[in-house]
Amino acid sequence: MESEARVSELGRQGDPIRSPAKRDPARKDRILAAAADLVARHGYHAVGMADIGAAAGIVGSGIYRHFDSKAALLSALLEQLMDEMERSAAAVVAQADDDRDALERLVTTHVRFAIEDRRLLQVYYREAHHLPEEALRGLRRAQRHYIEEWVIALAPLRRELSDAELRVVVHAALGTTQAVLFHHSGLPADRLAELLEDMGRRCLGLPERAPTE
């Protein structure tokens, strides 16, 4: 009996130790991309977790291994957007030669986001109010940081404006890109970007660019 017990104990000790299943980052990205597309097209309330999982190729409840609720998914989606926008803004400002160059780069980068990440920005403008209060506060805080990059660059160029006026001008410049989010112009992306950048620059009061040959 003692020998059998020892063999049994050794058998248990020899059993392979299973590590917890790892989350696949690519799968999480697929979920976020599917959520952005579905929520942008149908609205937050009309889309369920099962719909998002199916669109991402996730079977059954696998989506809950990454997000415990639809609100958590929306929060992650918009947090990812603002993180990327903040990083890009900081990077282009750091590369700029002067304040005017910084604003030029900010306009170009923001227009690129509006065209390339149209679905994400649609969700941001239409559905952010569905976030839990704490997540919404964090999103608004990130938005203020993003706008601050623009205000800091604009202030030396528009010294006649007060701080409040500078922020109005920046919001107006950012608002020029919203038309592309909800209106399909049919224009080629390059031409659309050119128009949007021109409108943004005009809002900021930047001089016209010299025509390219």
Predicted regions and their residues:
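Amphipathic alpha-helical packing segments from all-alpha helical-bundle domains
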Residues: E133-R158, R167-V168, E194
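Amphipathic alpha-helical segments used for helix-helix packing
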Residues: A114-E134, F182
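Generic hydrophobic, amphipathic alpha-helix propensity
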Residues: R27-A35, I52, L77-L81, M85, ...
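Hydrophobic alpha-helical connector segments
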Residues: A76, A90-E116
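Helix-turn-helix
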Residues: R30, A34-A72
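Hydrophobic alpha-helical segments that form the core
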Residues: E4-R6, L10, S162-H183, R191-C203
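Short, structured motif recognition centered on aromatic/hydrophobic residues
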Residues: A36-V39, M85-E86, L103-V107, A114, ...
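N-terminal intrinsically disordered/low-complexity leader segments
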Residues: M1-A26, A210-E213
